[in-house]
Amino acid sequence: MEIMVEKNDLDFFVNKRIFITGHTGFKGSWLTYLLDRNKAIIKGYSLSPISKPSLFSNLKFSDQFTSVISDINDFEKLRNEIVNFKPDIIFHLAAQPIVLESYENPKNTFDTNFRGTLNLLEI
């Protein structure tokens, strides 16, 4: 198996303040875990995991990690969390990714995937 990332590349994230939206999803959980293991200071912002048990709830995180369970469409809460945390880096992974759900609830999908991103960019 080919090594995709050298350890020295991950040293960049040591003690960086990182804000991750969608940290309870599949990709967000792994990103949070990887950065946490590399001593980043992380605040995650996401809805509760949709599956039980979830990958997110099965992973173990350090005391450097804080999880906020909230909706990316709540502009004031999102703004307050980002402003108070003062991140060096923001990873935006929050989304409504389920295609069938997008057909059944297109407004929610639009709000989350478009307006949620717009909320983040407005801050």
Enumerate the predicted regions with their spans:
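N-terminal Rossmann-like NAD(P)+-binding domain of SDR-like oxidoreductases, especially those catalyzing
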Residues: 1-123
